[in-house]
Amino acid sequence: MVRTYGLTHINLMVRDVKRSLRFYGQVFGVEEYGRSEGLVHARTPGCQDVITFDEQASGAGESRGIAHFGFRLVSPGDIDAAVDEVERAGGTLLRRGEFSPGYPYAYVADPDGYEVEIWYE
């Protein structure tokens, strides 16, 4: 086994870096910490996880075998506010429910069509 610190980042091909940073910032609180030509690096709140937005018109929104990625809620009562925020930021609700009573989830699509799970555990 290779020793690692775990998964550190994902790289999303997006049509519009500014739009993606605005969406993920508004909905999930990610903050830009660096950029280079066509790339913006953003950290998620409370940890060192990174999302890189890679501006490329071709390939944007294509999953290429990745079904979804997720953000875990702090409180199960936050699910309604999370879905509302997604829709205000230009995303869409795909489906929602509960894994079991008191453990809600919602699958949403970002403006490029990437599927994002919002869930509580």
Please tell me what each predicted stretch does.
Residues M1, A57-A60:
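Short, flexible, solvent-exposed loop/turn segments with mixed acidic/basic and small polar residues
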Residues S36-E37, D78, E98:
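Proline- and acidic/polar-enriched loop/turn elements at helix boundaries
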